[in-house]
Curated annotation (Swiss-Prot):
Compositionally biased intervals (Basic and acidic residues): 262-281, 420-441, 456-478, 559-570, 706-716
UniProt GO molecular function: chromatin binding; histone H3 reader activity; transcription coactivator activity
Domain UBA: 290-330
InterPro entries: RMI1_N_C_sf, RMI1_OB, Tudor, Tudor_TDRD3, UBA, UBA-like_sf, UBA_TDRD3
Ranges of biased composition (kind: Basic residues): 346-355
GO cellular component labels: cytoplasm; nucleus
Organism: Danio rerio (Zebrafish)
The protein's name: Tudor domain-containing protein 3
SUPFAM superfamilies per record: Tudor/PWWP/MBT (SSF63748), UBA-like (SSF46934)
Keyword annotations: Chromatin regulator, Cytoplasm, Nucleus
Length: 733
């Protein structure tokens, strides 16, 4: 057996012992020689009887050569130089790829040179013998006639399969264009030729991919059209453009601060329409209020109630950011003062429909809270001016009598009732820092309220923001009378007015009372500026508008001190205004509002409590401040006289200093005080003076605001507060 196996290996046949025995049994001869076994093995498949002799990694590319002789069985032959459909093509030189096996390991040989005995017609199962050393490149055996010999042989089951596949390949494209066959190939640029060889009706019935319900029924279409028509009608009735899933003006409060402010009246109309039952003009089950449910859920998760969140989204076209800003603004706003029984609820003048200013501010949520431009910011710090103060209406002065009954007069329904404004308006709309919101406190007497600035400023605002023609008429008439005197608007006697006029003339001549003409030369006065009573300072807005220097000359300081003596003991409203009345509108949209009283209206520091009876937040500044001050009403009940020790509010830094009362005005509205620590004198309102024991009861300091003042020497002030971050204002119409 070993000799037989060795003899077969010399011939290149690697057969297993079982294979040799099988070949012996298949041979008809009793004594089988290696030649007989080879003849039998030629017609048998090597896979069951062959022994593995090819390297296992012959296909890995690491083998560079294969030494023969060895016999392999052809598995498949393919012409790789032609397409599979036309392997017999002679358009390109033939290159055969021969797949062979030793029964266990398969390898690939490539026709490196022309093989004369192997072709595409060589059937699988044919045995070939590799001779000598065959080169192997990248796992491919390089074959030529010198390296390979065809031994022949036929393996029946392999030949049958091969012939069957070849016959199928010849007939596979014969049914082109027929039913069930592939479509004919149409060259590019030519039209398709349709060959209807079958009945098209029968073919349509057999189409399984046809949609059975491609067209909706007429009833479905009618229902859809009805819903669509109802939805369009509903949108038309609501008179607003609905934006789904958010809104086109996200961050509007930053990118376009005036967008919501300009459409305030439109929002009011929309709100009133929403308050009506929507079921009146919508079809049931067809349309409903379109609120972004996701945005609504997000807002509710933050702790807001559903109704408020829903309304905010409706008001802002489902804009989540703007609606959230609106809700936060409402939550942070201070509560409005309770409305008294004898006083009807305040109306927003000039805007109709009973809207108060607070409602409008709430609706325009997300508006900036400070000046939007650098010019507006500087105006707010240096003082914003309006013409309204120089034209106090008769209606205002008729309601002012004295401190004792001013509270009742402020509630008189027949007189002027200023609407409550948003507490933050003084910061946002560049109000003069000393004249603030009219609220729960009574109006002052004629002495202290001839320049009741909150009322005047609000009048000016209404005038600039859509006040009625009557308002324009009254104010223009007052403007013509203002340069002459304010005394005509008071109910005081002619005698007192005449006396006041004489005193004023004396003061202008420099012959006023000596007690009011103290020069601030005996001590470092806290202010470096002129007193608020300086007529030049009162005319300063006009001076600036006329192009005059912002800072007066060196003689101005002395003249401003002399102005202390010019504070005649008449009502504040009777001071003759020096210079024409200005009606110049400011760049930020507010009318210039100026006053002629002793307290400067255009400095950024809060005034000496001249409107405390009129405004709960009169101490608020136009810039960022610490907070509103409580009014000092204790002065209404203190009978001040010359020589009394007190705490007096200094107008520039809004702080109380120890002072001595030098003289009290006959009207009981103002007094001249001498600051004990500095020696300079100031005329201040009585409601800005408090007893010494109140020193600890009230916070008199206002910090965190940067003050821009006119008429100074250009030098920085001592202990100047730091500036808070800048906040742009809300936009204006």
């Amino acid at each position: 057996m070993c000799d037989l196996s060795s003899a077969l290996i010399k011939e290149g046949w690697y057969l297993t012992d079982e294979g040799i025995e099988e070949c012996k049994s298949s041979s008809e001869k009793e004594k089988t020689s290696p030649t007989d076994i080879i003849q039998v093995a030629l017609n048998n498949d090597l896979r069951p009887i062959g022994k593995s002799f090819l390297p296992a990694d012959i296909n890995s590319g690491r083998i560079e050569k294969l030494e023969g002789p060895c016999v392999l069985q052809v598995q498949k032959i393919r012409n790789v130089a032609a397409s599979k459909d036309h392997e017999e093509s002679q358009a390109a030189p033939r290159m055969l790829r021969v797949q062979m096996t030793d029964g266990h390991t398969a390898c690939t040989g490539l026709e490196f040179k022309q093989l004369s005995k192997i072709s595409l017609n060589t059937p699988p199962g044919t045995k070939v013998k590799l001779l000598g050393v065959v080169q192997v490149k990248n796992g491919i055996l390089l074959l030529d006639d010198s390296k390979i010999a065809v031994l022949g042989g036929e393996v029946d089951h392999m030949i049958e399969k091969w012939e069957f596949q070849r016959s199928l390949a010849k007939h596979s494209r014969r049914n082109i264009g027929a039913e069930g066959g592939p479509p004919p190939f149409v060259p590019f640029g030519q039209k398709c030729v349709h060959k209807e060889q079958v009945d098209s009706r029968a073919l349509d019935q057999r189409k399984t991919l046809q949609s059975t319900n491609a067209v909706k029924s007429a009833d479905d279409n009618d229902e859809f059209e009805k819903q669509r028509t109802a939805a369009i009608a509903e949108v038309a009735k609501s008179k607003e453009t609905r934006t789904f899933g958010g809104g086109g003006n996200a961050g509007g409060n930053l990118a376009n601060p005036g967008s919501s402010y300009k459409s305030r009246d439109t929002y009011q109309r929309k709100r009133e329409e929403r308050e009506k039952p929507w079921t009146e003009n919508k079809s049931d089950g067809v349309y409903r209020d379109l609120v972004d449910e996701r945005a609504l859920r997000d807002i509710m998760e933050m702790g807001f109630n559903r109704e408020a969140a829903r309304q905010a989204l409706l008001d802002n076209n489902n804009n989540l950011e703007v609606a959230l800003n609106l809700l936060l603004t409402r939550a942070n706003q201070p509560r409005a003062a309770p409305v008294e029984q004898s006083r009807p609820p305040p109306r927003g003048k000039g805007r109709g429909k009973g809207r108060s200013r607070q409602d409008e501010d709430e609706e325009a949520g997300g508006r900036p809270s400070g000046p939007s431009t650098l010019f507006d910011f500087l105006e707010s710090k240096m003082g914003t001016f309006s013409i309204d103060d120089s034209k106090p209406s008769q209606q205002d002065h008729q309601t002012k009598m004295n401190f004792s009954n001013s509270d009742q007069m402020s509630r008189d329904a027949g007189q002027f009732k200023p609407p409550p404004r948003n507490d933050g308006r003084s910061q946002r709309n560049d109000r003069p820092p000393r004249f603030q919101k009219d609220g729960d406190f009574p109006k002052p007497t004629p002495a202290s309220s001839s320049f009741s600035q909150p009322q005047k400023w609000r009048d000016g605002e209404r005038t600039g923001r859509g006040g009625g023609p009557e308002r324009w008429k009254n104010e223009s008439q007052d403007a013509r009378n203002a340069p002459v005197s304010y005394s005509s608007s008071f109910s005081k006697s002619r005698e007192q007015q005449g006396a006041s006029g004489k005193e004023l003339n004396k003061e202008q001549d420099g012959t006023g009372p000596a007690s009011f003409r103290k020069i601030q030369s005996n001590g470092p006065a806290p202010p470096k500026f002129s007193t608020p009573a300086d007529p030049k300072m009162r005319n300063e807005p006009n001076n600036r508008r006329k192009g005059r220097p912002e800072r007066p000359n060196s003689g101005y300081f002395e003249h401003s001190q002399d102005a202390l003596g010019k504070k005649d003991f008449q009502d504040e409203g009777q001071f003759v205004k020096v210079g024409p009345v200005s009606n110049t509108p400011l760049p930020n949209g507010d009318l210039e509002h100026r006053r002629t009283g002793p307290i400067k209206p255009h400095f950024s520091a809060p005034p000496p409590r001249q409107t405390n009876m009129h405004n709960p937040a009169s101490k608020r500044r136009s810039g960022p401040i610490k907070g509103p001050r409580d009014s000092v009403d204790i002065n209404n009940f203190v009978n001040w006289k010359a020589g009394d020790q007190c705490l007096a509010l200094y107008w520039e830094d809004n702080k109380f200093y120890r002072a001595r009362i030098d003289a009290v005005h006959p009207s009981g509205s103002t007094a001249v005080v001498v600051f004990s620590d500095y020696g300079n004198c100031e005329e201040v309102l009585l409601d800005s003076i408090k007893p010494l024991h109140m020193d600890d009861d009230e916070d008199v300091y206002y910090e965190n605001s940067l003050e821009f003042r006119r008429g100074g020497d250009g030098q920085p002030r001592r202990s100047r507060p730091t500036q808070q971050y800048y906040q742009p204002p809300r936009a204006r119409d």
